[in-house]
Design a protein with these regions (language model features):
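C-terminal extensions of enzymes
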Residues: 128, 136-188
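Alpha/beta enzyme core
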Residues: 1-101, 109-130, 176-178
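Short, solvent-exposed helix-helix connector turns and helix-capping sites enriched
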Residues: 1, 135-136
């Protein structure tokens, strides 16, 4: 109501000059990493990396890390999944900076696979939101507990007692793709 709301949207970047910021902004080049480092001591991670060439450029231009992401499938829903992009990116980065991966990770087994394939960390989004929406803080805590337990069960079953012991020898590509509609999703 007008008693407590002005009716004016106030985004988190209110007060910042956002002129020229956008996906097609010609000023948005790899040099922005150096400009950002001039004004902050925070680590600069580049999100949205999906190919080896971009990950190599992120390293070259001084990024402190990258996030392999297709923004939950909303940005590039017909491209490869991020887990499919990960091996070439891990190879290009070659341990020089951390690699976080997100988009589509729902279970502890998903987290295990990403770590085994070379991710430094895995971002989880929607499961937290589902927990929050259903049960508030307790729901978020339960989601965290479930993901942790699933990861630990997978680690025990694989004989990997620590996160650092998880490696590529513990996952493999079965060499084929399961066609859409063959996973039971059509029943949902």
């Amino acid at each position: 109501c007008a008693a407590c709301h002005t009716g004016r949207a106030k985004p988190i970047f209110d007060g910042l000059n956002m002129q020229g910021v956008g996906l097609n902004n010609p000023a948005m080049t790899w040099d922005v990493i150096a400009r950002m480092k001039e004004v902050t001591d925070m680590k600069i991670f580049i999100k949205g990396i999906e190919v080896a060439a971009d990950s190599a450029l992120a390293v070259q231009y001084g990024a402190d890390g990258i996030v392999v992401s297709n923004h939950g499938g909303r940005a590039t829903e017909t491209d490869k999944g991020t887990i499919e992009c990960l091996p070439e990116i891990v190879s290009a980065v070659n341990g020089r900076i951390p690699i976080i991966i997100d988009s589509g990770f729902r279970r502890g087994t998903d987290v295990y696979k990403a770590l085994a394939m070379g991710a430094s960390a895995v971002g989880i989004g929607r499961p937290y939101c589902w927990g929050l929406g259903a049960f508030g803080q307790a729901g978020v805590e339960r989601v965290l507990d479930l993901l942790n337990r699933e990861l630990l069960i997978t680690m025990v079953g694989s004989g990997t007692p620590t996160i650092d012991s998880i490696g590529p020898d513990y996952v493999h590509d079965v060499g084929h793709r399961v066609p859409r509609g063959r996973l039971g999703r059509e029943l949902l």
